[in-house]
């Protein structure tokens, strides 16, 4: 099958001069090595390829474009293909909100031993920008980058010369650097002290909350980016983790510690998990460790998001919620269900500063 891929069972049986049912049984007994395509032909999984291109009609690729591309192709975490190509098209820039999800998806695929390639051949500018963001420092070493993986960047040099970009920093329980402090320093350098303490606090809470619900060996990360949009400066902060996710770790604690909340949001009802996340953001107090032991982080984050008139989106394994704040209060909330699989918690925090 290495020389002649995509053969049907009867064709393989004919070549080997054996019964077709023997071939079929062998193939189904070894699905970790073989896969059947849409034409019922069999091939080695490592030769079965899926390409996902993150296309966008405008300049910036956002998390919405990422989600549309996954909806179009399906999550590669659920597909039968052993070889996944994630492609960045020409003449497009990648916002951190999209870069974080591409990075998380690639690392999750590498964790399950898929052959993964990131294709920047049509967009060297995006590759260069993401290099400055330390994207490739966070990328699993087994992932191939086209046309080639950049050499390691000079961390101190980038930190000193890039005030509008905080590179994707690892979230570690015992790290060399305090990530929220690094955000605050960069924010003050670029924009003065306005809102710097609020940003520091909200991101500290979000990062702490993600750490509490992680339970994974894949390192999480956070980053801060600013860009000009229609006469104002837009700030995008991301916190991304590939663990179990907030909802998955809260659920087991509800029946034991918060039965009234469990009754309010039964898993059998549609959108129940999304509503649970919104409830935690608005009311706080929920913790996998029980009452009075943490659980205030999401509510505190919501309060500071309101003070910044921010938009917050929280992506879980198969759904997301979005909370939009105006006039320092929650203006609206929404959710999207049935999203393609992406493990963990992926938070995007956006707000504007008028010049």
Model-derived features with residue positions:
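Conserved ATP-binding N-box helix of the HATPase_c
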Residues: 103-105, 194-230, 302-305
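Charged low-complexity interaction tracts in eukaryotic proteins
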Residues: 24-49
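A short acidic, leucine-rich amphipathic alpha-helix
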Residues: 11-13
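Flexible, glycine-/charge-rich segments associated with ATP-binding catalytic modules
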Residues: 47-78, 140-142, 248, 252-259, ...
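Conserved short strand/loop->alpha-helix "switch" segment adjacent to the catalytic nucleotide/phosphoryl-transfer site
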Residues: 93, 181-204
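Short capping segments at the starts of secondary-structure elements
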Residues: 2-8
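N-terminal assembly/transducer modules of large multi-domain enzymes
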Residues: 25-26, 50-140, 337-355
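ATP-lid-like helix-loop hinge signature
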Residues: 209-253, 258-259, 333-336
């Amino acid at each position: 099958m290495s020389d002649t891929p995509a053969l049907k069972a009867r064709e393989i049986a004919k070549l080997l001069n054996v019964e077709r049912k023997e071939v079929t049984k062998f193939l189904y007994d070894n699905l970790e090595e073989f896969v059947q395509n849409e034409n019922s032909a069999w091939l080695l999984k490592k030769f079965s390829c899926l390409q996902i291109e993150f296309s966008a009609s405008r300049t910036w690729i956002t998390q919405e474009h990422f989600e549309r591309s996954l909806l179009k192709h399906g999550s590669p975490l659920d597909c039968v293909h052993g070889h996944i190509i994630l492609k960045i098209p020409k003449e497009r820039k990648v916002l951190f909100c999209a870069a974080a999800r591409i990075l998380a998806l690639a690392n999750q695929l590498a964790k399950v031993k898929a052959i993964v390639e990131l294709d920047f051949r049509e967009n060297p500018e995006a590759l260069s920008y993401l290099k400055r963001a330390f994207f490739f420092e966070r990328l699993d070493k087994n992932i191939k980058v086209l046309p080639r993986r950049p050499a390691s960047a000079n961390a101190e040099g980038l930190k000193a010369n890039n005030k509008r970009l905080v590179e994707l920093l690892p979230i570690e329980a015992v790290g060399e650097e305090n990530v929220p402090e690094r955000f605050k320093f960069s924010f003050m350098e670029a924009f003065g002290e306005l809102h710097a303490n609020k940003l520091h606090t909200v991101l500290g809470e979000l990062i702490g909350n993600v750490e509490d619900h992680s339970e994974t060996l894949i390192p999480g990360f956070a980053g801060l980016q600013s860009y000009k949009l229609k006469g104002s400066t837009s700030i995008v902060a991301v916190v991304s983790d590939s663990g179990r996710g907030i909802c998955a770790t809260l659920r087991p604690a509800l029946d034991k510690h918060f039965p009234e909340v469990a009754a309010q949001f039964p898993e059998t009802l549609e959108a129940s998990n999304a509503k649970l996340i919104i409830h935690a953001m608005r009311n706080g107090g929920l913790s996998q460790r029980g009452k009075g032991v943490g659980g205030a982080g999401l509510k505190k984050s919501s309060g500071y998001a309101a003070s910044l008139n921010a938009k917050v989106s929280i992506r879980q394994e198969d759904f997301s919620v979005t909370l939009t704040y105006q006039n320092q209060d929650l203006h609206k909330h929404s959710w999207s269900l049935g999203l393609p699989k992406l493990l963990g918690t992926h938070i995007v925090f956006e707000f504007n500063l008028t010049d």
